[in-house]
Every structure is written in C-alpha cells, then in structure tokens.
A protein has these predicted regions:
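Conserved beta-strand scaffold positions in the cores of enzyme catalytic domains, especially
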Residues: 79, 125, 151-154, 223-225, ...
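A generic local structural motif
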Residues: 64, 79-83, 112-113, 173-175, ...
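Helix-to-loop junction immediately C-terminal to a conserved catalytic motif
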Residues: 68-100
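A transmembrane-helix-recognition feature enriched in membrane-embedded lipid enzymes
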Residues: 23-80, 108, 115, 120-121, ...
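Short, flexible loop/turn elements at secondary-structure junctions
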Residues: 83, 100-102, 129-131, 194, ...
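Non-catalytic C-terminal accessory region of glycerolipid acyltransferases
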Residues: 2-34, 45, 165-300
Length: 300
C-alpha cells in the first residue's frame, strides 16, 4: 500500500511540474519605470491575455478579426508552404519570424492561421509600447485590430527610444521568453528587422536586431520563417484593391528551422546577432523563391 501512495505522490509531483507556470509580472522597480497611464494600459492588456479572457478574445480574433480581413483580401491572398506550419508540434510554442513592410503584415498571417488551420492557438505580437500603451487611441486600436494580442510592449526600440523605460523592457523580454517557451498553441509573431522597411524594393531587408536572437537563445521555441509581400500601408486602398485590381498578397511559410547550433553557443550578443542573421538569410531564401516566380509579373 505504501508503494501505491508513493507512486501516486510521484505522479502528482510530475503533474505539478508539467503544469504551465503562472504568468510573470514585473517587479516594483520595473513597473515604476512606466507612467500612470502606461501602468493602467499594461495591467488591462496583461489581464486580457490570460486564461478565460484570452480564450474569449482569441475567439473574437478568429471570427470577427479574421472574418473582416478575409472579406477585404480574399481576391488577393495567395498562401504557400502552409504545410510547414501544420507539421510542427502544436503542443509547443511556435515563433513566426517575418519581414516587415506593412502595418498589416501580421494581420494577414493571423487570418491565414485562423482560417486555414484547425488546431487550437492563441496569438501574441510584441509591439512598441509608445503608441499602443501610451494613449487611449493606441489601446482602442489594440482592441479592435488586435483583440488585445499586441502584447507584451517594448519601449526602448526603434525610432525615438525611451531609455528610462529600459527596466520594464527587461520584464517584457522575460515575459516574451515565457510565452515562447511554454504553452500549447502559443504563436508569437516577431519581426527581426525591428521596424518597418520603407525601401521600395520588396526583396530588400534591414539588418536584424539582436533581440530576436536573445529570445530564441533563452526560449528555444520552434521557429518558422515567413516572407510577406504585396501589402499596402493605406487601409482604404488595400481594402478597395480586393475588388479593383490591387497587388496580390503572397505569404510564404518556410520549413521549421534547426537552431541547435546556436542554442549550444555561448550566451552572448554575438550569438544573438548570428541568430538574427541566420533568420534573415532564411527569409531572404523565401523572398528569392518569390522573386523567381513572380518578380517580373508582380500582379500575378
């Protein structure tokens, strides 16, 4: 009988260790780096990305969000390599790393996932906090466009960084690592370039930022490269183009990447940069495939 009790205790201990950990929260010092409004915005958005609330907003995102994006793009959308997304282990988080040319890049990617795949998922898109977490308009956009999925926020990135908020960014990275390391169905969308590429050439890219390398080194998620082309930054023009001859929107999903070589390396900024360069090389390969097939006939 004692053996049965011992075995049951071991099973219960294993169950507890296998259960996902609670969502990380910022320390007092990290939270103090934010303004009053930013704290309120973060508290609300953080709560909306947990438990029942996250499931509710994910349903809204999959039904309403993906629905209107589909209606606005169905004549233009072309998807390639979706079988690579289907082939990953959906009991583990998936990190999608994509080039960044339009405000709407990840919206069309999320619509594709919700409409073309059936496995349970919840999406997270780390963003610059300077818009989405600093004023009511930004919060409203996060609600109606992202269904609160633009989370966690980073403030010391891109143009006009705010160094005083660096302590909070350290928390956001820890939280992003947690989301990328544990949680069945977690899908994290990330742009290695760190900002929108405004070059007229859709096959040109910016240098990757080291943050993506640190994320992968710390979390070791499944990673798939994505190349997106054909999207505008003008919302009315983009929607009207669906019926009046707009550019075709092409999304290429690559094969899952083997990053074991980098995971085994020293935890150093140089390693982070090497990972970023490797990711962009894989996105470039997808871009070259697109160029070879469509480069001379952009409207095809």
């Amino acid at each position: 009988m004692s053996d049965e009790v011992l075995a049951r205790a071991k099973m219960e201990q294993a169950d507890r260790s296998a259960a996902p950990t609670e969502a990380l929260l910022p320390t007092f010092e990290e939270f103090a780096a934010l303004s009053t409004f930013e704290r309120v915005a973060f508290r609300l958005t953080h709560r909306m990305n947990l438990g029942t609330w996250k499931r509710f907003w994910t349903w809204c995102q999959s039904f309403f969000g993906a629905g209107w994006i589909h209606i606005s793009t169905y004549n233009l959308m072309r998807i390639y390599g979706l079988e690579n997304v289907e082939a990953v282990d959906h009991s583990r988080p998936l990190l999608l790393v994509a080039n960044h040319r339009s405000f709407f890049d990840m919206y069309v990617v999320s619509t594709t996932l919700f409409r073309k795949t059936k496995w349970q998922k919840q999406l997270f898109f780390p963003v610059r906090g300077r818009f989405y977490y600093q004023n009511p308009v930004g919060m409203f956009v996060n609600l109606i466009m992202g269904w609160w999925s633009m989370y966690p926020p980073f403030f010391v990135t891109g143009k006009d960084p705010v160094p005083a908020k660096r302590p909070f960014d350290k928390y956001s990275m820890r939280r992003l690592v947690q989301l990328s390391r544990e949680g069945a169905g977690n899908v994290v969308g990330f742009h290695p370039e760190g900002t929108r590429n405004k070059n007229d050439d859709p096959y040109a890219f910016l240098r990757p930022q080291p943050g993506i390398g640190k994320l992968i080194k710390d979390a070791n998620p499944q990673v798939i490269p994505v190349f997106i082309t054909g999207l505008s930054n003008n919302l009315p023009k983009q929607v009207l183009g669906n019926w009046f001859g707009g550019d075709k929107i092409r999304i290429h999903f690559g094969r899952q990447l083997d990053l074991s070589e980098f995971i085994a390396k020293k935890d150093h900024v140089r390693t982070y940069k090497e990972i970023g360069e490797f990711l962009m090389s894989k996105i470039t390969e997808l871009a070259e495939q697109d160029r070879e097939e469509f480069g001379e006939r952009r409207q095809a």
